[in-house]
């Protein structure tokens, strides 16, 4: 029975990391599309848009990194 709980912990960590990666990929895709749309509408604002784009992209990308850290913690420290 102990082996089943270990398998469930590994599965939970894998699902957590996978869903975080999928969510970040979708978010960055939408963000990139909106950046290109804004740059096409007002080309003179590209430097401002680029700065905001990279700041928000870093924040969106931080969520999967936190999930990977928590997943590895669950896999190696808790289990």
Curated annotation (Swiss-Prot):
Q: What is its main location?
A: membrane
InterPro entries tied to this protein:
ATP_synth_csu_bac/chlpt (IPR005953), ATP_synth_F0_csu (IPR000454), ATP_synth_F0_csu_DDCD_BS (IPR020537), ATP_synth_F0_csu_sf (IPR038662), ATPase_proteolipid_c-like_dom (IPR002379), F/V-ATP_Csub_sf (IPR035921)
Any transmembrane segments, and where? Answer: 11-31, 53-73
Its subcellular locations are: Cell inner membrane
Q: Does the keyword Cell inner membrane apply?
A: yes
Outline the subunit composition: F-type ATPases have 2 components, F(1) - the catalytic core - and F(0) - the membrane proton channel. F(1) has five subunits: alpha(3), beta(3), gamma(1), delta(1), epsilon(1). F(0) has three main subunits: a(1), b(2) and c(10-14). The alpha and beta chains form an alternating ring which encloses part of the gamma chain. F(1) is attached to F(0) by a central stalk formed by the gamma and epsilon chains, while a peripheral stalk is formed by the delta and b chains.
Q: What is this protein called?
A: ATP synthase subunit c
Organism of derivation: Proteus mirabilis (strain HI4320)
């Amino acid at each position: 029975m102990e082996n089943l709980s270990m398998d469930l912990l590994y599965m939970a960590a894998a699902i957590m990391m996978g869903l975080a990666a999928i969510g970040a990929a979708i978010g960055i895709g939408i963000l990139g599309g909106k950046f290109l749309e804004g740059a096409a509408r007002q080309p003179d604002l590209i430097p401002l848009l680029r700065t905001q784009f990279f700041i928000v992209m870093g924040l969106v990308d931080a969520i999967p990194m936190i999930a990977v850290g928590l997943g590895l913690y669950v896999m190696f420290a808790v289990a």
